[in-house]
Amino acid sequence: DIFDNLKLRVGYGTAGNDNIDDNMYATSYGSGHYGIGGKDYITYVPGKTLGNKDLKWEKTETVNVGLDVSVFGSRLNVGIDWYNNTSKNLLIKNQIPSSTGYTTQYQNVGSIRNRGVEIVINATPVRTKDFTWSTDFNVAFNRSKVLDIYGGSSESDYFIQDYESRMGFKIEKGKPLGQFYGLVYDGLYTTADFIQNEDGTYKLKDGIASLKGFDRKSVKPGDVKYKALSGETDANGNPVWSVNDRTVIGNASPDFTGGWNNTFTYKGFDLTVFMNFSVGNDVFNMSTQRFVGPYLANQNTISDMANRYTLIDPLTGKETTNLARLAELNPGEDNGSRMWNISSNNKYAISDHS
């Protein structure tokens, strides 16, 4: 026989999400104390989460088709699975207006789909009396898609921002999950972006973009630039950037993931070597975001800060406004790896992590 095992598998299932707090349909209250006139009065205190009587069960429907094949005396085994998982009535603790007296409320916010293929290969290339080598390889391809967002179409319905990192994620109907959303880093302002005034100061050239509503006279060489994608201009026709220039700048979801495991056995000894890999995903580097910038007194920074842009002339110990001198102090100032004032959610902190 060619096959030691040949099996076709088809499965369907549905399940809820049990990782949700209890009784979120009800609004809870606590007690507090209020002193007045020398007396202590007991009052009620609202909780943090407002109940939602319209909550529905979150439900995931799973369809799976698989094929298992074993040959060569089961020394080579291959498993292939195709799956399609659809989650509806997703339950998320959403922020709500403070005017309600609460901060959050569990809501059914939408539906998503995860579809993909998983391949597992197990083999025993060598098997002798004293020595055995067995190897396992797996690779998985997953594609997510937001199928629906319930009850809204404004940006606040699909834009989530982490407070600590200030990195935004855009959740958009018809698009995959994991989209990084922010400004596109465009390097630093260099001396070529400015004109030297007769009094020794400098000013930003016309046509060079700046932050909307920010005084162009305050922009300095070494400040960070972002791309003005929306076409907005100021009163003088100069391009400006703002929150309207945010766009998708990466995706945290990999194109595929996998692993390779090898076990070598010799008599009573064994050695296992394994590796995992992820290809095509972007990573937000919070260390770059947190430890790069001009406002880091009395704390450590990353080594990249040693190559930061400087406005201080070491000959005088003071800030210089002479553009020629600044160019001398900052050779390669147009190199995108130089930095000084990095803030906000932007593409500088996003990198390919394959």
What function would you assign to each model-found segment?
Residues 1-33, 47-49, 53-354:
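Outer/extracellular conduits and scaffolds centered on Gram-negative outer-membrane beta-barrels
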Residues 36-40:
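Charged, low-complexity intrinsically disordered boundary/linker segments
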Residues 41-42, 52:
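Catalytic-core segments of enzymes that bind and process phosphorylated/nucleotide-bearing substrates
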